[in-house]
């Protein structure tokens, strides 16, 4: 199989959707679908550039990568949300007869989406790149995602943040991700200058910060 679309399992997706909370404005099932759409382009580019990729690993990883996000992972015995999602993936994939080696690769790829994780294999890089693809989306989508993540964060911590405070936090987080180059296709790495991905992320972030500096608390989140 040479594309994500060729291997999508809509019956499985309907089951996995139940592991996502529709109440979350960002980490809902649509986010998983969006990352799979991004992976379609990423893996196609890999093939164009002679980079071999296991599409099934990428597909399963992205399908499950934020499953159970609304649950209290620590109370369930998992150090991170990614570890819980990976466990849910392993259980379900084993139930439907997916081989052990594929499951191990899926678990590793899901764990590689953690902020501080390393990403070494092509599949891990593709999954992390797809998960972060929204950073390089159009500015309207990027800004909407930023606002939705603010809502989620406030719900989780039980406190409200001003928009400038949130933008400051987002700036630090995104710059951290920005510092970690995803050495995959030419879209993500350019030996002769800034890659198209990094340029798009930088421009989105600079505009977000500039707007926040200009308008402060009065900025509209919708």
Language model segments and positions:
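Acidic/His-rich, divalent-metal-binding segments that scaffold phosphate/diphosphate chemistry
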Residues: 1-71
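Divalent metal-dependent phosphate-bond-processing catalytic cores, especially two-metal-ion Mg2+/Mn2+ enzymes
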Residues: 25-52, 64, 115-222
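Mid-sequence acidic-hydrophobic segments that form the walls
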Residues: 42, 70, 88-96, 109-116
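Metal-dependent catalytic cores of enzymes that make or break cyclic nucleotides
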Residues: 73-79
């Amino acid at each position: 199989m040479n594309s994500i679309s060729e291997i999508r399992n809509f019956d499985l997706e309907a089951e996995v959707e139940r592991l996502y909370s529709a109440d979350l404005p960002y980490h809902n099932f649509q986010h998983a679908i969006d990352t799979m759409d991004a992976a379609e382009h990423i893996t196609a580019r890999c093939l164009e550039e002679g980079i071999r990729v296991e599409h099934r690993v990428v597909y399963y990883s992205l399908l499950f990568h934020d499953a159970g996000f609304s649950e209290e992972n620590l109370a369930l015995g998992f150090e991170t949300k990614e570890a819980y999602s990976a466990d849910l993936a392993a259980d379900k994939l084993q139930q439907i007869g997916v081989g052990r080696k594929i499951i191990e690769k899926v678990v590793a790829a899901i764990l590689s989406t953690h902020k501080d994780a390393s990403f070494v294999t092509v599949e891990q890089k593709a999954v992390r790149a797809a998960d972060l693809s929204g950073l390089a989306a159009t500015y309207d989508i990027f800004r909407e995602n930023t606002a939705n993540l603010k809502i989620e964060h406030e719900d989780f911590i039980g406190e409200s943040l001003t928009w400038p405070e949130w933008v400051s936090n987002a700036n630090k987080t995104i710059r951290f991700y920005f510092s970690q180059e995803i050495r995959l296709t030419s879209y993500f790495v350019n030996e002769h200058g800034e890659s198209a991905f990094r340029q798009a992320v930088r421009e989105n972030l600079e505009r977000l910060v500039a707007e926040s500096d200009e308008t402060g608390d009065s900025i509209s989140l919708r």
